[in-house]
Curated annotation (Swiss-Prot):
UniProt-annotated location(s): Spore coat
Keywords for the protein's UniProt record, in alphabetical order: Sporulation
GO biological process, one term: sporulation resulting in formation of a cellular spore
UniProt keyword annotation of Transcription regulation present: no
Species name: Bacillus subtilis (strain 168)
Name of the encoding gene: yraD
Protein family (similarity comment): Belongs to the CotF family.
Name of protein: Spore coat protein F-like protein YraD
Length: 99
């Protein structure tokens, strides 16, 4: 993408942290959706496939959350620290138009 367009649209601030958080949120949604689908499966074969996909989604979630914790971007066991990080990210997002 053109650097000028990236700046004007705010796409120049797409960081690894933002991408990782988006993937983590998507992984959480995948886990939830596979779990719900498995409980509604019409046949044992379909349920088995959905459970296998659920396990893969759980593995992906674990890998993403571990990566983010190693980087200091995610603090699931320390709510106070996570709130501080979230507030810092909010302040950064608010300041983006002025950067």
């Amino acid at each position: 993408m053109n650097p000028i367009i990236e700046y004007l649209t705010g796409m120049n601030v797409l960081t690894d942290q933002i991408i990782a958080m988006d993937l983590l949120i998507s992984a959480k949604n995948g886990v939830r959706n596979y779990a719900m689908a498995a409980t509604e499966a019409g046949t044992p074969e379909v349920k088995e496939v959905l459970i296998r996909h659920l396990e893969e989604a759980l593995d992906m979630h674990e890998q993403l959350s571990s990566y983010m914790m190693e980087k200091g971007w995610y603090h699931p066991w320390n709510p106070d620290e996570q709130v501080k990080l979230n507030l810092k990210n909010i302040d950064t997002a608010i300041q983006l138009p002025t950067l």
